[in-house]
């Protein structure tokens, strides 16, 4: 199951990155998760999955994510001195549901769903800085994915890499070693 879950994650991510480059996005992360899951089910002859199973995997599971255990206690401390925002390819609804489940309080939430341009497009990052009335050089992008941080850095953001070696289970993350150009590792 771990391999299938990671394949679902990989393909859903691929379906989202750079969305909105040529035309307005036709789906959000929830939609991508569902159509990718249906592809994987078909490719692996897993037709035993019911519509309820598909809904539970594609929708309910990501809307019930539990965040990293060290994060809820540290978020309020960061907010004492900084604007702390969620900037994500996930749907607004996933962010709302997971924030409630994990008792997270953000200063602001930015979903690429509302911007109409998805990461890794430069416009997504630049738009967030503009909405915050900040220069890109005043923004720090914190993530555990080099590809996201590299894109943020390319438009002028400062970057911080957080190691999350268990994020992908036994398989390990696709890019476990931070790019040495990040500002904080």
Q: Could you describe each region identified by the protein language model?
A:
Residues 43-44, 81, 101, 131:
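Alpha-helical structural context
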Residues 11, 80-81, 112:
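Structured helix-beta-strand junction loops
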Residues 76, 87-185:
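Asp-based, Mg2+/Mn2+-dependent phosphohydrolase catalytic module
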């Amino acid at each position: 199951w771990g391999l299938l879950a990671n394949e679902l994650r990989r393909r859903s991510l691929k379906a989202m990155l750079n969305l909105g480059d040529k035309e307005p996005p036709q789906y959000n992360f929830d939609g991508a998760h569902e159509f990718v899951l249906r592809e994987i089910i078909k490719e692996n002859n897993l037709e035993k999955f019911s519509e309820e199973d598909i809904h539970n995997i594609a929708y309910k599971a990501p809307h019930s994510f539990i965040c990293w255990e060290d994060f809820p206690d540290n978020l309020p401390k960061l907010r004492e001195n900084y604007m702390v925002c969620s900037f994500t390819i996930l749907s607004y609804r996933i962010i709302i549901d997971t924030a409630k489940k994990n008792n997270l309080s953000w200063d602001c939430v930015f979903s690429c769903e509302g911007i109409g341009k998805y990461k890794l497009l430069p416009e997504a990052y630049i738009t967030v800085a503009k909405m915050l009335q900040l220069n890109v050089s005043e923004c720090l992008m914190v993530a555990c994915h080099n590809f996201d941080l590299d894109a943020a850095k390319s438009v002028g953001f400062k970057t911080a890499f957080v190691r999350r070696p268990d994020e992908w289970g036994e398989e390990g993350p696709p890019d476990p070693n931070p790019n040495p150009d990040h500002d904080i590792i």
